[in-house]
């Protein structure tokens, strides 16, 4: 197929379609190499099609050159961009140049961006001008990645939503010690002048901001952009960050619309917002500094929230290594907060299914233990646990073996663990067997007053097998609804 298409191009037969077909064919790496051999051997020159009288042919040729990353054609593509009169083709040249050597022309692109951002486009031109502006912005930042703004915070008043586990927002609210903190469906709402004091709390999933003047809007792209542009958003960005405009953003839409419709709607909002802010806010899907979340309500209107990616979350910076079944550190932190009244300071602690060490590390941050041991059958998990624990500046003794064969010279005070669960690697029957073995094992390694604090997705097995080894359930707390999971404390 590649040979046939190349011959057709050289014979000037259905050029536009042949270029388009080649773009599809080279998704296969072997076919890509075959096409490149035609070009490198001098048997095909794609640059000639940049001068074709048909605009769509020029567009397809530029995009194919970009797909192949033919840096040798950088000058030709740049020249074609500068001389192109058809607006919808100009975006294609810029897209191609992202994969080529466009650095020598960056000043030209900057000047073009400034000129185009001031240009009053007609209704017919508007869409294509917006596309070219967006492509210019992406290209400029590919050549010279922009310096991300640094969040300063300061004594501003922030209207925040700390998103949490939906069943336990009260845990995060209590840790805030803020009179305005109130639990809601989304987490904890709080109005605060002390944001920097709240950021280190370990039990929230993410932080969103409600911006005065942009609480909600009608389901219309122009209206949404007007509400956002007329709000306190620009002032907030300017007053809480080091550096000047522009700021880069993306729009996220959560609604009943199909994905393609959501994407179109988000692009319309973003484009209008760029226009209304004189391009002080610029849309980017790859290097954005903040997100505008548009969440459809029952009435059809949208609630508007902002996430600042300029706020660096260092709470779990130790957790660089993980495996597919690793518990999220924010979930481990929540388990610790829920169970801390049952944890003994200076205890001897064991996690027999330790994975990459997250449970033990998070426990130590809240209730200091004496000696901690982690066991896992996976050499990879143990290696990663050691790495993470060193980053956390903690000491845990890790052992790579089947925990049920583990013996120790003295008893432990506590087992704190996330129990295994059925996955593609473990069947339900195997999980049942783990629980059947676990409680006799726990009885053997724990002292007479020993405690089990476990996170489980198999509550029924706990109830079935715990009693056989004389363990009684002191407390059970539902952690997630779907799938059902529980924190269970036994003695």
Tell what function each PLM region has.
Residues 1-9, 35-49, 70-82, 103-115, ...:
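Amphipathic alpha-helical scaffolding segments comprising HEAT/armadillo-like alpha-solenoid repeats
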Residues 8-14, 48-56, 82-88, 115-120:
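Short coil turns that connect the paired helices of HEAT/ARM alpha-solenoid repeats
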Residues 15-37, 59-68, 91-100, 127-136:
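Structural detector for internal amphipathic alpha-helices that build alpha-solenoid repeat scaffolds
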Residues 82, 98, 113-276:
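Non-catalytic nucleic-acid substrate-recognition regions in nucleic-acid-modifying enzymes
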Residues 236-324:
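Non-catalytic substrate-recognition/targeting regions of SAM-dependent transferases
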Residues 319-336:
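Conserved SAM-binding loop and adjacent beta-strand
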Residues 332-410:
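Conserved S-adenosyl-L-methionine
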Residues 398-483:
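S-adenosylmethionine
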């Amino acid at each position: 197929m590649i040979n046939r298409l190349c011959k057709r191009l050289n014979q000037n037969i259905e050029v536009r379609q042949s270029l388009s077909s080649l773009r599809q064919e080279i998704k296969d790496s072997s076919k890509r190499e075959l096409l490149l051999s035609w070009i490198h051997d001098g048997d095909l020159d794609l640059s000639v099609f940049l001068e074709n009288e048909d605009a769509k042919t020029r567009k397809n040729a530029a995009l194919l050159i970009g797909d192949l990353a033919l840096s040798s054609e950088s000058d030709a593509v740049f020249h074609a961009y500068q001389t192109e009169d058809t607006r919808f083709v100009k975006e294609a040249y810029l897209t191609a140049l992202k994969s080529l050597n466009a650095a020598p022309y960056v000043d030209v692109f900057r000047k073009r961006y400034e000129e185009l951002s001031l240009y009053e486009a007609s209704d017919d031109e508007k869409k294509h001008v917006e596309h070219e502006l967006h492509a210019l912005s992406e290209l400029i930042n590919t050549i010279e990645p922009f310096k991300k703004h640094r969040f300063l915070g300061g004594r501003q008043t922030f209207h925040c939503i700390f998103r949490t586990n939906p069943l336990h927002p009260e845990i995060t609210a209590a840790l805030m010690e803020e009179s305005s903190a109130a639990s809601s469906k989304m987490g904890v709402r709080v109005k605060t002048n002390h944001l920097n004091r709240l950021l280190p709390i370990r039990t929230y999933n993410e932080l969103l901001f409600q911006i005065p003047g942009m609480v909600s809007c009608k389901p219309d792209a122009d209206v949404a952009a007007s509400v956002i542009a007329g709000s306190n958003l620009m002032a907030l960005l300017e007053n809480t960050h080091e550096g000047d405009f522009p700021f880069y953003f993306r729009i996220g839409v959560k609604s009943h619309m199909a994905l393609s419709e959501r994407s179109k709607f988000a692009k319309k909002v973003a484009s209008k917002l760029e226009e209304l802010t004189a391009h002080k806010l610029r849309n980017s899907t790859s290097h954005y500094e903040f997100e505008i979340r548009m969440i459809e309500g029952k009435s059809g209107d949208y609630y508007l929230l902002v996430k600042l990616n300029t706020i660096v979350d260092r709470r779990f910076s130790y957790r660089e290594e993980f495996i597919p079944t690793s518990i999220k550190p924010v979930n481990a932190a929540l388990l610790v907060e829920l169970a801390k009244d049952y944890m003994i300071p200076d205890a001897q602690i064991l996690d027999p299914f330790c994975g990459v060490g997250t449970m033990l590390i998070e426990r130590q941050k809240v209730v200091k233990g004496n000696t901690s041991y982690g066991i896992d059958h996976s050499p990879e998990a143990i290696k990663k646990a050691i790495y993470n624990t060193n980053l956390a500046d903690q000491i845990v003794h890790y052992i790579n073996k089947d925990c049920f064969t583990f013996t120790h010279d003295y008893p432990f005070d506590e087992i704190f663990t996330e129990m295994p669960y059925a996955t593609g690697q473990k069947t339900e029957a195997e999980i049942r067997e783990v629980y059947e073995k676990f409680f006799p094992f726990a009885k053997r390694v724990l002292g007479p007053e020993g405690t089990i604090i476990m996170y489980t997705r198999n509550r029924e097995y706990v109830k079935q097998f715990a009693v056989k080894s004389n363990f009684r359930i002191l407390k059970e707390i539902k952690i997630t609804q779907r799938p059902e999971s529980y924190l269970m404390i036994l003695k």
